[in-house]
């Protein structure tokens, strides 16, 4: 999709009059260039979030690594600012490569951690991404790598994803499904997929202690996960009340 023509907007008088708004629009329009430059200049890094068990005391089961980029001034570009501009382009595959490379480096440096890295179904057919993966699966690394793919992405190419899982799991690699229950998954595919873990979509988690609908849906998703011997994780737990109710429903 072509970027908006800011010059044309200025001619017709629809450009913002506030300099800060103008700067924000210009930055947004130039986001693909910012992403490209950040990758070329090695200004990519991972932010880490722990995933903890529901037991008492809670323990870190693994960490999630999220790609972050720095602008020329060293400020962090939140993923929400740039991902929508590039995720369906070649730059999106470059981001996947950078994320995987950084994750594998972290696993080599810290032999006691497990780490989940995001990928997409399209990454499987990307030669550069596969070379990064194959080169980084040193002994002891594959067993601690979790590749995380969204429910929607998995359903785009289910046969490709299934074959890739069958190839990687003998090497110790685990797989997690993100956004489980978001609405695209056909449950008949679950018996074919080889996911080790599912992450229940945050929409079923928010305010669950006071939402009968979310309680029923979350319990159903947890039951499905356990039926297929998958570890059930709840996304976006923010309060103790949510955590307490999810523990009662059987989340792992």
Regions found by a protein language model. Give the residues of each.
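Signal-transducing alpha-helical linker
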Residues: 23, 27-30, 87, 91-96, ...
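Active-site core of bacterial EAL-family cyclic-dinucleotide phosphodiesterase domains
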Residues: 16-83, 118, 177
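Catalytic core of bacterial c-di-GMP phosphodiesterases, primarily the EAL and HD-GYP domains
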Residues: 59-64, 91-160, 236
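The catalytic core of metal-dependent phosphodiesterases that act on cyclic dinucleotides
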Residues: 136-208, 224-252
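Cyclic nucleotide signaling catalytic output domains
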Residues: 1-30, 34, 81, 85, ...
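Charged helix-capping and loop-helix junction motifs
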Residues: 130-134, 160-164, 212-219
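Conserved long alpha-helical elements within nucleotide-processing catalytic cores of c-di-GMP signaling
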Residues: 80-84, 93, 166
């Amino acid at each position: 999709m072509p970027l908006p023509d800011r010059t044309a907007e200025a001619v017709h008088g629809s450009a913002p009059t506030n300099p800060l708004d103008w700067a924000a629009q210009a930055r947004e329009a130039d986001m693909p260039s910012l992403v490209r430059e950040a990758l070329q200049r090695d200004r990519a890094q991972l932010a880490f979030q722990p995933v903890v068990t529901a037991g008492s005391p809670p323990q870190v089961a693994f960490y999630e690594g999220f790609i972050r980029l720095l602008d020329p001034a060293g400020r962090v570009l939140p993923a929400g600012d740039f991902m929508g501009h590039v995720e369906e382009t070649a730059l999106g595959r470059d981001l996947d490569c950078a994320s995987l490379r950084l994750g594998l480096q972290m696993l080599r440096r810290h032999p006691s951690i497990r780490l989940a890295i995001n990928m997409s179904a399209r990454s499987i057919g990307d030669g550069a991404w596969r070379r990064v993966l194959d080169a980084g699966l040193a002994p002891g690394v594959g067993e601690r790598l979790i590749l995380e793919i969204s429910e929607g992405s998995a359903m785009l190419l289910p046969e490709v994803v299934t074959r890739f899982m069958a190839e990687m799991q003998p090497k110790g690699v685990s797989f997690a499904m993100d956004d489980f229950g978001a609405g695209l998954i056909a449950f008949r595919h679950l018996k074919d997929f080889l996911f080790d873990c599912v992450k229940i979509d945050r929409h079923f988690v928010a305010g669950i202690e006071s939402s009968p609908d979310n309680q029923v849906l979350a319990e159903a998703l947890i039951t499905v996960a356990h039926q297929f011997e998958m570890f059930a994780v709840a996304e976006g737990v923010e309060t103790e009340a949510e955590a307490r109710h999810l523990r009662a429903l059987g989340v792992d």
